[in-house]
Design a protein with these regions (language model features):
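Short amphipathic helix-loop junctions that connect adjacent transmembrane helices
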Residues: 157-180
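Intracellular juxtamembrane helix-capping segments at the cytosolic ends
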Residues: 25-39, 244-259
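Helix-loop junctions at membrane interfaces in 12-TM secondary transporters
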Residues: 1-15, 223-235
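Structural signature of the two symmetry-related core transmembrane helices
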Residues: 1, 206-221
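A membrane-interface helix-boundary motif in multi-pass transporters
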Residues: 67-94, 288-307
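Helix-to-loop junctions at the C-terminal end of transmembrane segments
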Residues: 190-204, 290
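Juxtamembrane intracellular "pre-TM" segments in multi-pass secondary transporters
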Residues: 108-146
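Multi-pass alpha-helical transporter architecture, strongest
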Residues: 95-106, 245, 281, 301-326
Length: 326
């Protein structure tokens, strides 16, 4: 039984790693389609709509799986042990596979100049370096990427470790954590729409500045939060700015790409790698500070520092065609 449990754990870990790698790779191509399917004046709206639809899908599937796990008798699964949980994983895979077919059939087709696998291995690293060389020559793109790196360290760490903070510092139970996750997803949908409208009105840079200020306030508030009601309010604020900062970061980056660039995938590959590196930095800083301080409240303040650094760098970015207020 112990060996079987160990084998199942190994399968779970390997499956998680494969899924993470698959998602990380797919999001590069997904993001890179934005300049191909929308004109610059529509980047904010289309990027926000993409995140909004993604959050709608995640909420629907999450609710379905929660019902399967919580009320297995409704689905004829009573007394089947862990089968409802395993079925939930299966539904996620089928959901991804099914909706991927829609994307494959509707998105613009690839060009004919495809590379061999050998060429991909040889040229991939060179393409990455080429993007960085171009970015260094474009001052505003380079500044935005530095800003994005630092505030992404905060954003991705909050997304990944919010439930840990809730269970550790707020002593929240599983059902309460589920409510927090649902709250984040629903309000992220709303936030993506609100901040797309705001960015259209005042400009992407000013919109991001507003969001980073709010993120900083939320992190400082996390240090002082007492009681579950206050935490729910803070989680609601996180949800709003989470959806907004994700969609508007992508739209802003698209606006800063070199004029007439065709290989957007390479640029968004760099963007995604930078985000993953920021996630590693943020998670390490959060865990290290939590270990030193004996709690997670001080660690939340460290995340506020990341947002402030990103905010300061962002103020030096100039975006062509932006409104004067930006």
């Amino acid at each position: 039984e112990g060996v079987e449990a160990g084998q199942m754990l190994a399968i779970g870990v390997v499956g998680f790693l494969i899924a993470t790698a698959g998602f990380g790779g797919s999001i590069v191509f997904y993001n890179s389609y934005l300049p191909d399917i929308a004109t610059e004046e529509n980047y904010n709206r289309v990027s926000a709509k993409g995140f909004m639809m993604g959050y709608v899908g995640s909420v629907i599937l999450l609710i379905i799986n929660l019902l399967i796990i919580t009320y297995p008798a409704w689905f004829g699964l009573e007394g089947t042990g862990t089968l409802p949980v395993r079925l939930s994983f299966l539904t996620v895979g089928l959901w991804w596979f099914g909706f991927a077919q829609y994307a494959f059939s509707r998105l613009p087709k690839d060009s004919d100049n495809r590379l061999s696998w050998k060429a991909i291995r040889q040229e991939g690293y060179e393409e990455f370096n080429n993007v960085w060389r171009q970015a260094k020559q474009l001052v505003n793109l380079k500044r935005f990427l530095f800003s994005f790196f630092f505030y992404s360290a905060g954003v991705q760490t909050v997304i990944s470790l919010a439930s840990l903070f809730a269970s550790s510092e707020m002593q929240m139970e599983t059902d309460e954590l589920i409510l927090v996750i649902l709250l984040l997803q629903v309000l992220a949908l709303v936030g993506a729409w609100i901040f797309a409208k705001l960015s259209d009105r005042i400009g992407n840079k000013a919109g991001l500045v507003v969001m980073l200020v709010l993120w900083t306030v939320v992190c400082v508030g996390g240090y002082f939060v007492q009681g579950k009601i206050q935490f729910y309010v803070m989680a609601a604020a996180v949800g709003l700015v989470m959806g907004g900062v994700q969609s508007q970061s992508r739209a802003t980056y698209s606006k800063l790409l070199p004029p007439g660039v065709k290989d957007t995938t390479s640029f968004f590959s760099f963007y995604d790698v930078l985000e993953k590196a920021a996630t590693a930095l943020g998670s390490f800083s959060f865990a290290f500070t939590g270990q030193l301080s004996g709690g997670l409240r001080m660690a939340v303040l460290v995340l506020a520092v990341f947002f402030l650094i990103g905010l300061v760098i962002l103020t030096r970015v100039k975006i062509a065609h932006e409104r004067a207020v930006a």
